[in-house]
């Protein structure tokens, strides 16, 4: 493994550790963004399982959205993942933006999830 990859791996581990410390047992809302779609899932790290998930590929959203890669799609995914998390009994989460800046689609997803009842 090259030095660059080792440094990236160390940084990822450090970020995951910091999120686990701040979580205090709360599930985390993890975001993945690709060029065409956006995905969000609520993960319980203690149990190692996904409690709720949503993406711009979901059938209901896909037909209603023009594209899966804009702020409107991110907001719709945020609202949907918040509704599914509340159905699973989760109201408090820790936001895990990964390496993405809190800007644009990631911010739109987070704000929509907050407005729909998730607390973070």
Swiss-Prot record:
InterPro entries: Ribosomal_uL18_bac-type, Ribosomal_uL18_bac/euk. CDD domains: Ribosomal_L18_L5e. One of its GO terms (biological process) is translation. Transmembrane segments: none annotated. GO terms for molecular function: 5S rRNA binding; structural constituent of ribosome. One of its GO terms (cellular component) is cytosolic large ribosomal subunit. Keywords: Ribonucleoprotein, Ribosomal protein, RNA-binding, rRNA-binding. It comes from the Bacteria. Pfam families: Ribosomal_L18p (PF00861). HAMAP family: Ribosomal_uL18_B. This is one of the proteins that bind and probably mediate the attachment of the 5S RNA into the large ribosomal subunit, where it forms part of the central protuberance. Belongs to the universal ribosomal protein uL18 family. Part of the 50S ribosomal subunit; part of the 5S rRNA/L5/L18/L25 subcomplex. Contacts the 5S and 23S rRNAs. This is Large ribosomal subunit protein uL18.
């Amino acid at each position: 493994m090259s030095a660059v990859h080792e440094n990236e791996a160390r940084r990822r581990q450090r970020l995951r550790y910091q999120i686990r410390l701040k979580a205090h047992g709360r599930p985390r809302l993890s975001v993945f963004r690709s060029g065409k779609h956006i995905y969000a899932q609520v993960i319980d790290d203690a149990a190692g399982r996904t409690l709720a998930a949503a993406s711009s590929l979901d059938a209901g959203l896909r037909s209603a959205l023009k594209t899966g890669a804009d702020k409107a799609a991110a907001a719709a995914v945020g609202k949907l993942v918040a509704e599914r998390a509340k159905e699973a009994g989760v109201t408090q989460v820790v936001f895990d933006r990964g390496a993405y800046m809190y800007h644009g689609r990631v911010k739109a997803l987070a704000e929509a999830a907050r407005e729909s009842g998730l607390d973070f």
